[in-house]
């Protein structure tokens, strides 16, 4: 077989990860290796309840019902189109779809699996919202590994975020006084929110990333 971004496939591949005719369902097989798919897609009957309650569907041309229906076909061409599209990045992962599906599907999990595969195969770079994952990795992912937080007040620099206005600039310049009223250990070691995370805890966090494959995914 051929080895492509962590997957052994039975059959030849063209450049760019596209699968030749006659090897139907290989993208589907890749998706089914994601544990989220087993709970996310059981048996969609196209009722449309997920789309009706989806907040993202109110703002985008987005139909989670159609995404699940497409994946169910196991059609490589259709699934690849999803992997390269903007569509899979519209979901806010609120999981409103999860408790409402009469067949027990969770379209949000299917979208998560599609996003994961799109990133592993490099297809995410072909959509604007997909490419925004680079910014999220730098702005949030690296913050987690460095500080233990997704974001802290000191990371929202007014020079980089002028939309925050003059009030935020004042808060930023006086952050210890402002946030110190809520927690005396603000950005210091000790208990409480917004404390400085000690190095031992940060090392444990990094080890979790390494053991779960997160670090390899970050560096790929």
Where are these regions (language model features)?
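Local cysteine-cluster metal-coordination motifs and their immediate loop/turn environment
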Residues: 40-59, 88-105
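Short, Φ-rich (hydrophobic/aromatic) sequence segments
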Residues: 5, 138-141, 209
């Amino acid at each position: 077989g051929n080895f492509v971004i962590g997957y052994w496939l039975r059959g030849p591949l063209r450049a760019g990860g596209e699968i030749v005719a006659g090897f139907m369902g290989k993208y589907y097989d890749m998706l089914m290796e994601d544990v989220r798919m087993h709970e996310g897609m059981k048996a969609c009957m196209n009722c449309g309840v997920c789309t009706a309650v989806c907040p993202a569907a109110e703002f985008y041309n987005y139909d989670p019902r159609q995404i699940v229906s497409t994946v169910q076909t196991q059609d490589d061409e259709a699934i690849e189109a999803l992997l390269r599209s903007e569509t899979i990045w519209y979901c806010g992962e609120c999981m409103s779809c999860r408790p409402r599906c009469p067949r027990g599907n969770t379209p949000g999990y299917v979208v998560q699996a599609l996003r994961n595969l799109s990133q592993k195969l490099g297809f995410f770079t072909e959509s604007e919202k997909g490419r925004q994952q680079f910014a999220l990795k730098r702005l949030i992912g690296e913050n987690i590994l460095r500080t233990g937080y997704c974001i802290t007040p000191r990371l929202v620099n007014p020079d980089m975020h002028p939309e925050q206005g003059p009030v935020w600039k004042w808060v930023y310049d006086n952050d210890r006084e402002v946030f110190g009223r809520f927690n005396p250990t603000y950005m210091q070691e000790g208990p409480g929110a917004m404390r400085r995370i000690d190095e031992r805890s940060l090392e444990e966090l990094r080890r979790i990333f390494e053991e779960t494959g997160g670090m390899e995914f970050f560096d790929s």
